[in-house]
């Protein structure tokens, strides 16, 4: 065999191989490469979107946290105000109840004082009758001297 013939036959075989590859294999390879490039581009775009969404979610969570802290602060302030109002109301109720108790106690003291005075008047009248009976050495009839005792009681009042 001649080297020229071998070289030419190899060149023809190589040309046929290139032609076959370019016509039948190359489009599938290009399509696979393009699909892979598209998947990579989609993945990168999804990564960027995810990064932006993460940033937005971080901002939203920061805002929600800030709002929650503000709301919690408002709730604490309202609770403190309500507690203060309850304490003031309890103090006012205690004052009113204390005044009622004092007024009741004063009325009871006044009633007891009046009862004690009446009892003392009756005892004084009895002692006066006994004293008069001892002085006169005879017993004084209470029915006869009822007017006298009533006038003594009136003077003691």
Swiss-Prot record:
One Pfam family from the record: ATP-synt_B
Subcellular location, record wording: Cell inner membrane
Gene Ontology CC: one annotated term: proton-transporting ATP synthase complex
Transmembrane segments: 7-29
Keywords, in A-Z order: ATP synthesis, Cell inner membrane, Cell membrane, CF(0), Hydrogen ion transport, Ion transport, Membrane, Transmembrane, Transmembrane helix, Transport
Main localization, broad class: membrane
Membrane topology recorded in Swiss-Prot or TrEMBL: Single-pass membrane protein
InterPro entries per UniProt: ATP_synth_B-like_membr_sf, ATP_synth_b/b'su_bac/chlpt, ATP_synth_F0_bsu_bac, ATP_synthase_B_chain
Record family assignment: Belongs to the ATPase B chain family.
Description of how the protein assembles with itself and partners: F-type ATPases have 2 components, F(1) - the catalytic core - and F(0) - the membrane proton channel. F(1) has five subunits: alpha(3), beta(3), gamma(1), delta(1), epsilon(1). F(0) has three main subunits: a(1), b(2) and c(10-14). The alpha and beta chains form an alternating ring which encloses part of the gamma chain. F(1) is attached to F(0) by a central stalk formed by the gamma and epsilon chains, while a peripheral stalk is formed by the delta and b chains.
Function: F(1)F(0) ATP synthase produces ATP from ADP in the presence of a proton or sodium gradient. F-type ATPases consist of two structural domains, F(1) containing the extramembraneous catalytic core and F(0) containing the membrane proton channel, linked together by a central stalk and a peripheral stalk. During catalysis, ATP synthesis in the catalytic domain of F(1) is coupled via a rotary mechanism of the central stalk subunits to proton translocation.
Name of the featured protein: ATP synthase subunit b
Organism placement in taxonomy: Bacteria, Pseudomonadati, Pseudomonadota, Betaproteobacteria, Nitrosomonadales
């Amino acid at each position: 065999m001649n080297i020229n013939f071998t070289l030419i036959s190899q060149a023809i075989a190589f040309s046929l191989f290139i032609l076959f590859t370019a016509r039948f294999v190359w489009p599938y390879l290009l399509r696979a490469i393009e699909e892979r490039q598209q998947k990579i581009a989609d993945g990168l775009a999804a990564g960027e979107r995810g990064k932006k969404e993460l940033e937005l979610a971080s901002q939203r969570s920061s805002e929600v946290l800030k709002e929650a802290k503000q709301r919690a602060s408002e709730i604490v302030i309202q609770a403190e105000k309500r507690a203060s109002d309850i304490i003031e109301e309890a103090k006012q109720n205690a004052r009113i109840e204390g005044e009622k108790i004092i007024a009741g106690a004063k009325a009871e003291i006044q009633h007891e004082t009046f009862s004690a005075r009446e009892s003392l008047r009756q005892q004084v009248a009895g002692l006066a009758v006994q004293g008069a009976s001892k002085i006169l050495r005879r017993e004084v009839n209470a029915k006869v001297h009822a007017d006298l005792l009533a006038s003594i009681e009136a003077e003691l009042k």
